Amino acid sequence: MKPSRAIVLGAVQGPTELLPVSSSAHLPLIPWLVGWDEDGRDPELQKSFEVSLHAGAAAALLIGQRRVIAEELRSFDARKASVLALSFLPPAVCGLALERPIERRLGGPLSTAIGLLAGAAAMVVADRRPQLRDRGRATAADGLALGLAQAAALAPGISRNGATLTAARWRGFTRQHSNLLSRTVALPVIVGAAILKGVRLRRRGLPEEQRSPFAAGTATSFASTLASQELIRLVERDSALWPYAAYRAGLAGMVLGRIWRRRRRLRSSHEQPMRVASPASGDGSLAAGNGSPGRVSSPAGSRRKSG
């Protein structure tokens, strides 16, 4: 990957990390939509790059939200510990067990578009639930629901932020406290994923030519997330999730439309054999004795076969 492309993706990471629109969808879809030639990329290395962007965003959140974090730590108790632990265990277990199969089978544009649509539908449904609770009343069951949501967000397009916001609203929390819960439970998972990928990268080694893109992308992700902190308050103020659901559906529609057009062009290219007039019939039908496009059977050859 070129450093310039890493910088573009790092700049996208900040706002998409703070909004429930799935940064995990934007990172692979942008190169695909704009036509960057990444066919020879290593999937494991690509995923490590994405996690490095998440790590940059997490570092920016630790700085930008330090007052909120300090307040949480001052009031930390056994109940909050149980909520945090139960929100961490499902994504940790599923990540260790299913990370590689998910990367191999669910990393394509089609599965990402499906994830975007599924997340959008869940957000619209959750928005209709009553929202009366505050985070001070969160229980172990709430922590487990948030953990299962984060486990589901391992699939591209679902969005960790969107999944936890949806789960919190489904459990009846207000939009402000849903956002606070979402950010609180996400940080340990992001940091844990970054550590896991860091250990794997250390074992296999980072290619020399990839060090500059990794550094540039991580630094840009940190800066863009730090500069986008106002988006957190935007999500807190919004009374509905449907605008984000509409954006996700629009992006998914764009991806599905391009997939359909590509398949249509491919099908057309295979269904346009050369049409020639048969000397025997003169009716302009295909004269391809073996069914292959553009091959013409001679009358002599036909007589030899029939004899």
Which residues does each predicted region cover?
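Multi-pass membrane proteins that catalyze or facilitate reactions on polyprenyl-/lipid-phosphate substrates
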Residues: 1-307
